[in-house]
Structures are given as C-alpha cells and as structure tokens.
C-alpha cells in the first residue's frame, strides 16, 4: 500500500508539469513575437538584445540531392563527443561517409582556469590529423580539403566562415574562448600541426546541418511533400533553424542584404538559438525545481531556460531534484543512494526505461534502471510514483518542444504554400530519436497548437541522420577558400 501523503505530493508535483492547450497557444504567439524582435538590428551588447538571438548563418541555398563528385571534411564539436568525418557526395540523394568519434575529456568541463582555448582546439586538430592519417593517408598532404565546422554553441556569426563565441553551454567552462572567433582558433591549431591544407571554410551548427542534410536526403518523387522547412535538435541540448526571407532579416547589414538580393538570393537560414526562448520567464512554465537547477546546478544561470525544460541534459536532473525534495519532506527515503550528491547522474537513458516499463512486469525495468544508475532500491509502490513523475517531466518537454515548430510554420506560412501542402521537419538528437513516445507527444501538442489537427496532419517529423557531419560538409561545398 502506497503512502497517501507521498501519493498526494507526487500528484501535486505532476500537476505543475501540465502544459495546457491555452498555454501552448500563448507560448506559440510569444515565440513568433520573439522571432520578429530577434530579426531587428542588434544592440551593441548582444547579450542585451530582446527576443530570440535569430543568428544569420549566411547559408542562402538548400541542396537538391544531386550534388556529386566531391569529398569534403566536417568537424563536429557537440556536448559529449568530438567527431571528424569525410563526406563524398554521390548524387541521387546518396553519400558515403567515413567518421571517427571521440569522447571529449572531462577536464574541459571543469571549472579550471588552467584549461585554455588552445588546449581544446589543439585537441581537436590532433584528432583531425589522426582521422586523415587513418582514412586518407595517401592524400593527406596533397589535397586541398574544405572543412565545414559544426559548432553548436551561441556565436555572433558575421560571415559563413567566422563567428565569435557568445557563451558556452552544455557544460563547457573555458572562459578565454568567449568573444573569440572559433574558426580562427581551430584553423590556427590545424596550421600549427602541419594541416594548413585543411581550410575551415564554413561555420555552422547542428541545426543548420540537420536541415541541409535532410534536404539532400529528401527524395519525394511525387513532390507531395515540400522540401524540409525546419531543422531541429532535441538531444543534449535543443535548437532549431529555418529559411527566412532576406527582406525580413533587418539585422543584416543593408549592403550585404542588397548584394545577396542582387545575386538572386531570396532566403537565408536563421539559427534561432531557441534554447534561449523566454529567458525572462514571461510565459514559460516554471517550477521550483527548474529554478533550483538553473541557479545551483547549471553552468549558465539565467540563460537557455527553454533548453533546461526540454533537453536531455536536464530531464533526469529534474527528477533527481524532485526526489531530493520528497526526501526533505520525509516522504521518500533515498537511503545511501548516490543521487544525493551527484548532479546529472540520471540520464535520459535511465528515464527511457522507466517511461515504458509496465505494471505487469512489476516495474522491474524501473527497479533495475534506478539500481544501475543511482544505487537506489525501491518498492513497487515507489516505482509507480517515480514513473508518474518521469512521464510528467517528459510530456512537458515534448509539449514545449512543439511550440517552436508550430511558431515557425505559422510565421513562414509554410503550410499554405500550395494546394494540399505538406512539409518536413528534419530532426536529430537522442531525445527525439530514441526517447519513447517523444515524437508522438510532440505531434499531440502540435494538434493542440494554433496550427490545429489539420495542420498537424500535414507535418512530417523526419529523423535526419548525420546532420552535423553531412550538413556541415554541404555547408562547405560552395564556400570559398
């Protein structure tokens, strides 16, 4: 028999994570407003700008899928791994990829002033050299390589091949990188180890790469579905991009905009940096656990507050803080569990096992997952309540994840471009790809959003694999040395 007080407390907490239809509509409307504000000219201090960052990527074309006969490099600095790959475009929506992935050493995430930008980018350059030695030894020095660099952190991008870091996210704490051009930092280290023939010609992020990769792979022969209109990431972090009309990007230098228009360009990919949506907390659903995690356990308090409710890095931490609170109320006993003193120990993999476990199984998968992750023994009654919490956390995340999708579709009028118009959304990231039911919950929220059930039926959420690799290579394709 479960403790009535514990059950009541858990039910009360779950109620705090409910996102209603009216809240989805309110958030969608506000998101559009923040997009429009973000497209206006920037303040001199970029951190003081209102609205979303809405960073121009200087990518003005989407691939057709027929590009072929060239091999390029891509480097991807994510939140967990650094990856180098070579991409050979074969045409007909096909490509060949060679890649190596290495885990980023933990000391780069520690608050250690002795770790510098040079340490990080030298590490990346050495891994690039190892990759070329292994996979392209015969031409390592004889070939002029174009490289696209996927750097999925907020940057002030001023051209296709230059951008200064605004702030770190995802746990990095290397202070001297902020304000520096990350392309120059990487290129310098490549030059210093003898790879001056590798030219970092395009700076992109994982969302732009996801959109471009999905465009290359998309091959709807009947043209019943429009080419992808949004690229999005729901993994360790979250972000999204889309193609905006040049005439609406008022923050672009007027001369640059006119030059692009004179070249026949009509759109530019905008990196929304939607992880920063509503940092002012005007409308975002907020619990005491969200506030505590932001202020006490995150590396960037006050920033990326949308991301801290949606991304995989934080979902398990929300659960951990709820359990700590229940123990503080003397309603739950964490015993000697390592949960007490280890922030971020609960991963989305652990939550995934809990999410889909069944009562018929006595929630044994939940028991095993909590034992493995946190050395926490639980009763069946406790597991029932923990599963209820997990499902409340994930449902809120998925419902919030639908908001920017709906907002962009409305702002761009993407669902009304042609008769019976349907659109693709290219998605990447461990949460959207692997978390049980996440996409289904997103679709439910889209139907509740202002696009309605009719609009939701015309939206296709497609997993776009290798966006940060293939997409970065595609970004580099037409760039100059």
Curated annotation (Swiss-Prot):
SUPFAM superfamilies: Actin-like ATPase domain (SSF53067). Keywords: ATP-binding, Glycolysis, Kinase, Nucleotide-binding, Transferase. Pathway: Carbohydrate metabolism; hexose metabolism; Carbohydrate degradation; glycolysis; D-glyceraldehyde 3-phosphate and glycerone phosphate from D-glucose: step 1/4. Residues 205-466 are annotated as: Hexokinase large subdomain. Residues 4-477 form the Hexokinase domain. Its EC number is 2.7.1.2, 2.7.1.1. One of its GO terms (biological process) is glucose metabolic process. Residues 64-204 are annotated as: Hexokinase small subdomain. Pfam families: Hexokinase_1, Hexokinase_2. One of its GO terms (molecular function) is fructokinase activity. Gene3D superfamilies: 3.30.420.40, 3.40.367.20. InterPro entries: ATPase_NBD, Hexokinase, Hexokinase_BS, Hexokinase_C, Hexokinase_N. GO terms for cellular component: cytosol; mitochondrion. Residues 146-172 are annotated as: Glucose-binding. It catalyses: D-glucose + ATP = D-glucose 6-phosphate + ADP + H(+); a D-hexose + ATP = a D-hexose 6-phosphate + ADP + H(+); D-mannose + ATP = D-mannose 6-phosphate + ADP + H(+). ATP binds at residues 101, 466-471. Belongs to the hexokinase family. Glukokinase specific for aldohexoses. Phosphorylates glucose and mannose, but not fructose. This is Glucokinase-1.
């Amino acid at each position: 028999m479960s403790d009535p007080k514990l059950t009541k407390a858990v039910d009360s907490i779950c109620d705090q994570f409910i996102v209603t239809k009216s809240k989805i509509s309110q958030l969608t409307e506000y998101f559009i407003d923040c997009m429009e504000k973000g497209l206006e000219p920037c303040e001199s201090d970029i951190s003081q700008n209102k609205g979303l960052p809405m960073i121009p990527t200087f990518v003005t074309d989407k691939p057709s899928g027929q590009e072929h006969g060239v091999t390029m490099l891509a480097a991807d600095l994510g939140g967990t791994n650094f990856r180098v790959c070579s991409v050979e475009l074969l045409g007909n929506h096909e490509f060949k990829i060679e890649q190596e992935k290495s885990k980023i050493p933990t000391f780069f995430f520690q608050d250690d002033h002795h770790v510098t930008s040079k340490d990080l980018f030298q590490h990346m350059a050495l891994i690039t050299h190892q990759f070329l030695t292994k996979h392209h030894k015969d031409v390592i020095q004889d070939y002029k390589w174009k490289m696209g660099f996927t750097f999925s952190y907020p940057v002030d991008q001023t051209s296709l091949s230059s951008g200064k870091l605004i702030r770190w996210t995802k746990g990095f704490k290397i202070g001297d990188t902020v304000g520096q051009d990350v392309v120059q930092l990487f290129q310098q280290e490549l030059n210093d180890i003898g790879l001056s023939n590798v030219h970092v010609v395009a700076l992109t992020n994982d969302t732009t790469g996801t959109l471009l990769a999905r465009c290359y792979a998309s091959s709807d022969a009947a043209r019943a579905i429009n080419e992808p209109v949004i690229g999005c990431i729901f993994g360790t972090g979250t972000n999204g991009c889309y193609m905006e009309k040049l005439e609406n990007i008022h923050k672009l230098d007027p001369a640059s905009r006119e030059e692009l228009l004179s070249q026949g360009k009509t759109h530019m990919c905008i990196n929304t940096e939607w992880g920063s949506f509503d940092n002012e907390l005007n409308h975002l659903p907020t619990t005491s656990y969200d506030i505590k995690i932001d202020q006490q356990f995150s590396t960037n308090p006050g920033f990326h507050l949308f991301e801290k409710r949606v991304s995989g890095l934080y979902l398990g931490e929300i659960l951990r803080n709820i359990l700590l609170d229940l123990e503080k109320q003397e309603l739950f006993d964490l015993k000697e569990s390592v949960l007490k003193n280890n922030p971020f120990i609960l991963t989305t993999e652990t939550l995934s096992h809990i999410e889909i476990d069944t009562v018929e199984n006595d929630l044994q998968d939940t028991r095993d997952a909590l034992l493995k992750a946190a050395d926490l023994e639980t009763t069946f009654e406790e597991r029932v309540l923990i599963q209820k919490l997990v499902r409340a956390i994930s449902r809120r995340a998925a419902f919030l994840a639908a908001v920017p999708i709906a907002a962009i579709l409305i702002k761009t009028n993407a669902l009304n471009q042609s008769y019976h118009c349907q659109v693709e959304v290219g998605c990447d990231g461990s949460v959207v790809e692997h978390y049980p039911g996440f996409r289904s919950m997103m679709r439910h929220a889209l139907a509740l959003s202002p696009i309605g059930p009719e609009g939701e039926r015309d939206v296709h959420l497609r997993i776009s694999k290798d966006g940060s690799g293939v997409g970065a290579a595609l970004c580099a394709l037409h760039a100059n040395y």
